[in-house]
Amino acid sequence: MTLSVDIPRDPMAPAAARRAIEALSGRVADDVIPDVKLLVSELITNSVKYGGEGALRLQIEAEGPRKLRAEVIDQGVGFVPVARDRPATDVGGWGLHLVQTLSNRWGVHEGSTHVWFEIDR
């Protein structure tokens, strides 16, 4: 199953992305969906904060109930991906650390802000 949706860039974008992910119910395992929602929310939040102008695109390709690839694409200039270990007392900046920790693989397409992660359990 493929999910592809444009999400308006505004403070409610993470919630809109989580609602869109509900379309995966029944095709993706119930214990995988919460992690997908969390990681997509973190990436969408980063895109809203740093991703330039225009809509955001969320694409998810579910290859089975426990295997999927999610991508968040925006109009930003790109960045060097760094997921740092964070002190437990830090309030913010956990997004890429969570992506690194909860996904099997993740990365950024060079030259754009096109962040992806894969879950394969």
Predicted regions: what they are:
Residues 41-42, 48:
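Active-site rim helix/loop that mediates acceptor-substrate recognition in acyltransferases
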Residues 2-18:
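STAS-typified acidic loop motif
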Residues 1-4, 47-121:
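Conserved beta-strand-loop-beta-strand hairpin that lines the nucleotide-binding pocket
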Residues 15-41:
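Conserved short strand/loop->alpha-helix "switch" segment adjacent to the catalytic nucleotide/phosphoryl-transfer site
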